[in-house]
Amino acid sequence: MAFLQLFVGLLCGAAVSAFGVDPAVRIGVFQEFSPGQGFSGVTQVKGFRDDTRAFMFQGSSRSVRVPDAAAGHMLQKLRGKTEFSIALTLKQDKLNSGVILSIHHGEHRLLELESSGQKSEVRLHFRTGLQQTHTEIFPFTLADEQWHRVSVSISAAHLTLYVDCNRIYERVVPVPLMEIPEDSSFWVGQRNSAHGLFKGIMQDLQILVMPQGFITQCPDLNRTCPTCNDFHGLVQKIMELQDILAKTSSKLSLAEEKMSGLDSCYCERTCRVKDQIYREEQSWTDGCKNCTCSNGTVRCEKILCPPLDCPDGTTPAYVTGTCCKECQPMCLFSEQTLVEGQSCAVHHPSGLCQLFQCRDRTMHRVPGAEDCPALSCAESDQITLTDRCCRVCRGHDFCAEENICSENSDCVNLDAGASCGCKNGFRPLRLDSAYCEDIDECAEGRHYCRENTECVNTAGSFMCVCHTGFIRIDDYSCTEHDECASGQHDCDENALCFNTVGGHSCSCKPGYSGNGTVCRALCDGRCLNGGSCASPNVCVCVQGFSGQNCETDIDECSEGLVQCAAHATCVNLPGWYHCECRDGYHDNEVFSANGESCRDIDECRTGRSTCANDTVCFNLDGGFDCRCPHGHNCSGDCIHNSRVRHNAQIWVLDTDHCSVCSCQEGQVKCRRMVCDCENPTVDVLCCPECDPRLTSQCLHQNGLLTYSSGDTWIDSCQRCQCLQGEVDCWPLSCPPVDCDFTLVPEGECCPRCVSDPCQAHAVRSDISKTCIDEHGITRFSGSAWVKHGTHCTLCQCKNGHVCCSVDPMCL
């Protein structure tokens, strides 16, 4: 405790006694470079103060990127820091939504400060330790054509916004990760060459890499001691000491284990099959074969099917998941033998169809089977099937409906169904080829291996292995030893190895790219929204997305894939959806996925009604009614924002000049202004879709799409809007989650509840959430270590739980 008090005292003394700012911790952006020289759209003007330079940013086409040399010098001071402040003085044009500064690497925003006049918000974007971009939004209007002194101060997980020397907001946020690559770009007054253009004047723009940097603007403000970053650093030091102690304990335990194991050593031979480890003499079933691990070798025998003598009313038939036929109940229908579960369609000349299914040895008619969807193909390309009433188009993918073929068998689409066919190098174990076994070309003499080689059977094929001291001439013959033939190379599994004099070279196979040591599958374009390129030109999409490149969000709402409760409406989100309570209802902070938790709001009891004093509020389901007591002559007036509005009165909202409200018998009805684009006096700020000017159009972030004024779209978990040539984007609104542990699935934007704390993305900074490792050492939340006795198992104290996983790059 005495050490901690001394540590804190030293920190406080250093923070309070400091006078001025050390140039080593100040990034004076307008001192390092002048945007008024060589950059169109920027001019030097008179600022709020006369002793420093101020710059006006105007125009719709400019590219103010800090030169690489100056950017590298500035960013070096910020790299790896978790305590800094962004400070400046500005005067921003009304309704402008622009970026003050942005540090980018590729598509990732490492640090960005922007001010939205359209949404009246200040937004800070930064990268976190989870390699995700976190956005913190402060409802505040800077774009009012007035001078403001702004400071955003970050101290580890503590974020504070100061405006005009007033502390406006104070938040707890994830700790920023300022791992800034050398080739990062630094933009001023814009996000990139085409978006987020700030319009107005900026002065004294600087980043102060020091505790409580806001005091350079407002020296009279109170300072806290120690800062959150000081405390965070102390916790990190304790974690390092814990790790040293754990590593020492691990080495000691390992030494003790080795000493105790010197007397006797027995290594049991095991078998590895499909990433599964089997012990000696352990047996298992693999497809249609019974296998046993014997002395480290897998020995398999084909399952022999016994002859069947099926009783009356049954017939031999395959059952899903079995190798041998079994006696199954059957039905006789139209001279056909059907087994349990099979269907038969009766197509009448009149066009009617009836579907019957064999159940309990009796054919039962299946109701509703004749309700068929419309087909998109010509009638000549429509095929009538025997097991269903609905026709299908020629080329229909039956395999996608039900693939009963095993891993060594391919599903093949036919005109009226699907069948299984063994892959090359395999032969059927069942009559229908649903299960297939590998052909041992070596044992059966069906190989082409020549002298100096040994035939080795492989799944579906064989290979010729050179004898010791020989190298490969081609696939079937050898002459002496080289790296490629012996496997003593570092070529990727999707690369070809070429022997050279004194070495070898690797070249990726067609459809893959890389240096040969590492080869990755190529997909045209790239797999979007969390999709992965599984093989050349094949993207595997995560749930909620579709398309060749996973570029299409599945709108579960419009496609009717979900059914919200009666008092909720479906809201689509990228990769997901949620059910939102309708007007007049709320979930009372008890969230349910389908909106079942939505309950009526009692506007009368909660004081949300607008009834005048001479009427009586009567609650309704999803609303309310203002009723006049019997015998009274009521005015029908409304109470809105503590003001009396007369019955039939119409007014414009003070906070939104684009919304019109009216009083109707005690109830206030508000709506957006009706846009009549034919009216020459229409307000294009309220009706941006009525702005026909080309200068009011916006370019999409990818540079390939053009939007008109008023258009909205979703990009990178943000909802964007084009307004008179300016793009403003803000984070999507996510539904609340009532749980302890959440994660954001890849490709999605909003957190979902998970029961496993190890799957959760967020790591609590609460130091009381500790863990006990395998040595009995207490670990703080967020600390990580290599598990004792392993080299590749990484453990982490996460939300009070020990979570371990194997690092595949370590194996």
Swiss-Prot record:
Assigned keywords, A-Z: Calcium, Disulfide bond, EGF-like domain, Glycoprotein, Metal-binding, Repeat, Secreted, Signal
User: What pairs make up the disulfide bonds?
Assistant: 399-411, 405-420, 422-436, 442-455, 449-464, 466-478, 484-497, 491-506, 508-519, 523-533, 527-539, 541-550, 557-570, 564-579, 581-598, 604-617, 611-626, 628-634
Q: Which Gene3D superfamilies does the record match to this protein?
A: 2.60.120.200, 6.20.200.20, Complement Module, domain 1 (2.10.70.10), Laminin (2.10.25.10)
Q: Where is the EGF-like domain positioned along the sequence?
A: 395-437, 438-479, 480-520, 521-551, 553-592, 600-635
- Provide the residues annotated with a glycan attachment (glycosylation): 222, 290, 295, 515, 613, 633
Name the InterPro entries on file: ConA-like_dom_sf (IPR013320), EGF-like_Ca-bd_dom (IPR001881), EGF-like_dom (IPR000742), EGF-type_Asp/Asn_hydroxyl_site (IPR000152), EGF_Ca-bd_CS (IPR018097), EGF_dom (IPR024731), Growth_fac_rcpt_cys_sf (IPR009030), Laminin_G (IPR001791)
The signal sequence is 1-18
Q: Where in the cell is it found?
A: Secreted
Which GO biological process entries does UniProt record here? fertilization
- List residues of the VWFC domain: 269-328, 636-691, 696-754
* Gene Ontology molecular function: any one: calcium ion binding
Whether Signal counts among this entry's keywords is: yes
- Ranges for the Laminin G-like domain? 54-225
User: Is-annotated flag, keyword Signal?
Assistant: yes
How is this protein annotated for GO cellular component? cytoplasm; extracellular region; extracellular space
- Please explain the role this protein plays, according to its UniProt record: May regulate neuronal differentiation, polarization and axon guidance.
List the protein's name.
Answer: Protein kinase C-binding protein NELL2a
Q: Which organism is it from?
A: Danio rerio (Zebrafish)
Gene encoding the protein: nell2a
